[in-house]
Regions:
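ATP-binding Walker
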Residues: 14-17
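ATP-dependent NMP and nucleoside kinases share a basic, alpha-helical "lid"
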Residues: 85-97, 101-162
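N-terminal phosphate/diphosphate-binding loop that engages ATP/GTP or pyrophosphate donors
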Residues: 29-90
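Walker A/P-loop
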Residues: 20
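Residue-level signal for inorganic ion chemistry
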Residues: 38, 81, 110, 124, ...
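Hydrophobic anchor at the beta1->P-loop junction of P-loop NTPases
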Residues: 9-11
């Protein structure tokens, strides 16, 4: 069955806009499958690392994609049935994932792999390119946005809870720079699809943001 036959919700937006949390919770409410494209690159990076491949061995990596199984369950990510949620956050894996994401041939190879997550009863997919490249025919496209100030406050709160005392002004500078880089990058820049519904969730809770999306579905 093709992804066009399955109700698909694609969510994009800048870093820190809450698209990951919203997408996960939305998939639970709808009982849909869930795809986190960022985690996909990390898991593939881990699989490449485990197989001792180089990221530029594209043919071998494409073959590897046919062999591995990636799945998501609530806040956990699995590779061939093993919980790798912590492993994929390691610095070495993050760096390799970034290299893979910048390799256009590998990005193209990953298209069909990502689209294979579209299964009945439906899919909630979040991440870069979801609305424009991976699922251009998605039934519902969401661009989740929030101001730099709002995203800085959220990030500051997260870091404080982890015991890290950081300057919120520095966070604002970092996030603004990340936005600029994401929008100006040559490959896969951050874009707002013409068909996307823009939701600014400044001051909104996760539940309130999800309710706005559910209203669009209904």
């Amino acid at each position: 069955m093709s992804s066009e036959d399955i109700f698909t919700i694609a969510i994009d937006g800048p870093a820190g806009s809450g698209k990951g949390t919203v997408a996960k919770e939305l998939s639970k409410i709808l009982n849909y499958h869930y795809l986190d494209s960022g985690a996909i690159y990390r898991v593939i990076a881990l699989a490449i690392h485990n197989k001792k491949l180089e990221f530029n061995q594209e043919k071998k990596i494409v073959e590897l994609l046919k062999e591995i199984e990636i799945s998501f369950e609530f806040d956990k990510t699995f590779l061939d049935g093993k919980d790798v949620s912590s492993e994929i956050r390691e610095e070495s894996i993050s760096k390799l994932a970034s290299k893979i994401a910048q390799n256009q041939e590998l990005r193209k190879s990953l298209l069909s792999f990502q689209r294979s997550f579209a299964k009945k009863p439906g899919l909630v997919a979040e991440g870069r390119d979801m609305t424009t490249v991976v699922f251009p025919g998605a039934d519902l496209k969401i661009y989740l946005d929030a101001s730099v100030e709002e995203r800085s406050k959220r990030r500051h709160k997260q870091l404080i809870l982890k015991g890290n005392n950081v300057n919120i002004a520095n966070l604002e500078t970092e996030i603004a720079l990340r936005d600029k880089q994401d929008k100006e990058r040559v490959h896969s820049p951050l874009l707002i699809d013409d068909e996307a519904h823009i939701i600014n969730n400044d001051g909104l809770s996760v539940e309130e943001t999800i309710n706005k999306i559910l209203a669009l579905i209904n």
